[in-house]
Amino acid sequence: MQRIVYLERESVIAEVRRPAFAHQWTEYAKTAPGQVVERLAGATIAIINKVPLPAAAVNALPELKMVAIAATGTNIVDLEACKARGIVVSNIRGYADHTVPEHVMALMLALSRNLIAWRESVQAGRWQQSDQFCLFDHPIRDLHGATLGLIGSGSLGNGVARLAEAFGMRVLRAEHKNSATVRPGYTSF
């Protein structure tokens, strides 16, 4: 029987489906870094979100076979230590593939249009008091024709690139740092 320990249940508000295979499930609302090894003792599967799992912790857990990260990033886990031990590491792929790129574009539009400054001018009554049909207090820039540099070409970076290109932006993707070659469509880091 697999022993599954979820170290940070409060970090995910969605219902978590339990696996169909025989297992013992233990969950904690939150876990501090100093509690990781104690709470994962005897676990075969660890579910984590933000609490780090460094090499020392990985190596102190001989029964551990899998680390499931309830997030997109894997930077909280020592991947080399897991690989050396044959521990499978999985993360949530495809999460917010549309939501995050759309939010990025919304923020770029807000910045390029100076949305906050314009809102404050309207709230202060400047627009209503203007002798002109509009105000020229804050610069407005178009995204069309602008250049966007992206670091990362995973699903989120590619989603942002697609939307930016649809806006008529020039997209530069950064090649991996210290890469010996630069792929077509990329620029050196």
Predicted feature residues:
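Rossmann-fold NAD(P)-binding glycine/threonine-rich loop
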Residues: 75-85
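Rossmann-fold NAD(P) dinucleotide-binding segment
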Residues: 52-64, 81
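Rossmann-like dinucleotide/phosphate-binding beta-alpha-beta segment
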Residues: 134-189
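N-terminal glycine-/charge-rich "phosphate-binding" loop or analogous flexible N-terminal tail
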Residues: 1-43, 172
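Short acidic/histidine-rich motifs immediately flanking catalytic phosphotransfer sites
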Residues: 40-45, 62-64
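Phosphate-binding beta-alpha-beta segment of Rossmann-like dinucleotide-binding domains, i.e.
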Residues: 93-147
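Short beta->alpha connector loops at strand-helix junctions that form conserved
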Residues: 29, 70-71, 87-98, 175
